[in-house]
Amino acid sequence: MKWLRRVGVVLAVFVAVLVVWVGVAAVVYSPEYVIRVLSSRESEVSDYLDGFPLRTLAASPEPYTFAEDLDEDRVRGLFEAGFGVSDFDAFLRDGDTTSFIVIKDDAVVYEEYFNGNDRESMVTSFSVAKSVDSALIGIAVDEGFIESIDDPVTDYLPELAVRDDRFRAITVRDLLLMASGLDYQEMRWFLFNGDDPLTTYYLDQRDISLTNTNIVDSPTEYFHYNKYHPQLLGMILERATGMSVTEYTQTRLWDRIGMEYDGAWALDSVESGFEKMEAGLNARAIDFAKFGRLFLNGGEWEGAQVVSDEWVAESTVVDPALHNPDYYLSLIHI
């Protein structure tokens, strides 16, 4: 029976350590943050719809509607041949696809929804939000709110330089390139202090981005995925424009490209009210297609230049020096 007592002692010590561990995290961060982390699960398509408060983007007063020229059987045949599958719709359904739309010459040729979704279903951008972040920065440069993406980030976030003078060497461009030299470790020895949970679940993303970012390398040397970058870009947008990210998105993008439906930015919390810049833009699939159309047309929408063609060109050309072909100025190459 001694082994049972030993097991009981070990379990009791483990539980006590766990309780202390959770308690320390609740004091250092907040009880709400600890609850968010402990209740987190594998990523789901609804995470940024159900798990966070939302700030609405209203449908455009002048909605743009794609024409229809459906040729779904031809599209299915092309993809079935290309992917080597016998049933393209089943392939999409089995892959947990929510929606799949093909548009050619401004006309919808294929539009199907899967797994309980339809045209009215709101879906989350996930990292496509970073491409929207980039466009918003480009528009802010066009409008003169941001003088240049080669400005030091401390021109807009001077408190960073107070904490570490080396922040003066980091530019807005470095944030867009994910090449700032800032430390980012998805998980650390303590469940609650990894950068992934902090940038996902912490209830004040402005605070954590200003106080928990540390320089470990010189900027521009290499690409390193880092979710503090889009958060800092969001703060720069706020400071430079005097608007919330949602308001700037609404007036400079949503209204101008004729979004048919309401959308929403997920927020870190009601109290902080800061948009989750790394992944938290929600919209209907057909409206996300309009963002793609904007860039296909060099930033022009129905005769109006929404974002400069110079920005579109620069933000979609890969810089081989970064050794990463997937990101340039926060645009993801597919």
PLM regions and their residue ranges:
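Long, well-ordered core segments of solenoidal/helical folds
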Residues: 252-262, 312-323
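Short, charged, amphipathic alpha-helices and their helix-cap/turn boundaries
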Residues: 109-112, 154-155, 189-219, 243-262
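Conserved small/polar residues in nucleotide/adenosyl-binding loops
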Residues: 332-334
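N-terminal leader/targeting segments and the immediately adjacent pre-domain N-terminus
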Residues: 2-118, 145-146
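Active-site-proximal alpha-helical segments within enzyme catalytic domains
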Residues: 229-236, 277-300
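Active-site helix/loop module of the DD-peptidase/beta-lactamase fold
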Residues: 143-182, 214, 239-278, 283
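Flexible glycine/proline-enriched surface loops and loop-helix/loop-strand junctions
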Residues: 118-119, 213-219, 229-231, 270-277
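Active-site SXXK
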Residues: 106, 124-149, 175, 233-237, ...
